């Protein structure tokens, strides 16, 4: 089975413009989270869309689904997320397992709730690549020169930009394999390995690259929100 996992567990309000977490802010005529869920509703091969939110916001997220997505609510599961990204993925997979016991073939297309400009093409590319690989990471080519500094004061290295990519989401993983790999990590490793695909890479798994889009903006600052509003208005 193919599932979607929307990571909406953040509670940060550091934009300073609302008491709402970023994923619940209005973008155009509806919240950012709703825009994101709508993109996954368009892909018929996805069995369920599981949204992991902070426990304090579960009821609010359920109300948004009732209000904006009433025709699709049977495909959407709202569940309590974890304390960080990977534990939220873990909680999402546990919700999938509760819906239907996991099989080795089950995959979940995980995505940041605050990336509402994901395209159907990106979702479908992830699903297609995941059929033949252990995991899939969505990336775009690095357009700026990346410098490395180990002390924050002087340049240590300037890697070859031709080999560098900027990571986005979705990231698509095999559910059972993620649970096995994540469960094998020590507490110290879990603190360091905050990215699901990085876990697959260090464990020697096959992680394919899917082509992202520069428009696949992650809304984390006031400036990002202004850009997103401009993009919505143009559409």
Regions found by a protein language model. Name each.
Residues 1-59:
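N-terminal glycine-rich phosphate-binding loop and ensuing alpha1 helix
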Residues 26, 117, 172, 218-219:
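Short aromatic/basic micro-patch
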Residues 104, 117-210:
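Conserved core of the sugar-phosphate nucleotidyltransferase
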Residues 108:
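Short aromatic/hydrophobic "clamp" motif used to bind/position activated sugar donors
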């Amino acid at each position: 089975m193919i599932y979607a996992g929307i990571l909406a567990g953040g509670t940060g309000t550091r934009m300073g413009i609302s008491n709402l977490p970023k994923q619940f802010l209005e973008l155009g005529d509806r919240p950012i989270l709703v825009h994101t869920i709508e993109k996954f509703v368009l892909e018929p091969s996805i069995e369920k869309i599981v949204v992991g939110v902070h426990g304090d916001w579960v009821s609010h997220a359920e109300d948004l689904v009732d209000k904006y997505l009433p025709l699709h609510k049977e495909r959407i599961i709202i569940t309590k997320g974890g304390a960080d990204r990977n534990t939220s993925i873990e909680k999402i997979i546990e919700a999938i397992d509760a819906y239907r016991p996991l099989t080795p073939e089950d995959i979940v297309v995980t995505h940041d709730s605050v990336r509402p400009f994901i395209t159907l093409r990106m979702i479908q590319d992830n699903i297609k690549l995941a059929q033949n690989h252990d995991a899939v990471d969505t990336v775009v080519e690095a357009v700026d020169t990346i410098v490395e500094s180990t002390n924050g004061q002087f340049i240590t290295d300037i890697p070859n930009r031709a080999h560098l990519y900027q990571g986005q989401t979705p990231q698509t993983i095999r559910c059972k394999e993620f649970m096995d790999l994540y469960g094998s990590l020590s507490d110290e490793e879990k603190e360091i390995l905050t990215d699901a695909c990085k876990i697959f890479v260090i464990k020697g798994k096959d992680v394919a690259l899917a082509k992202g889009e520069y428009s696949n903006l992650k809304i984390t600052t006031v400036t990002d929100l202004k850009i997103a509003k401009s993009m919505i208005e143009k559409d």
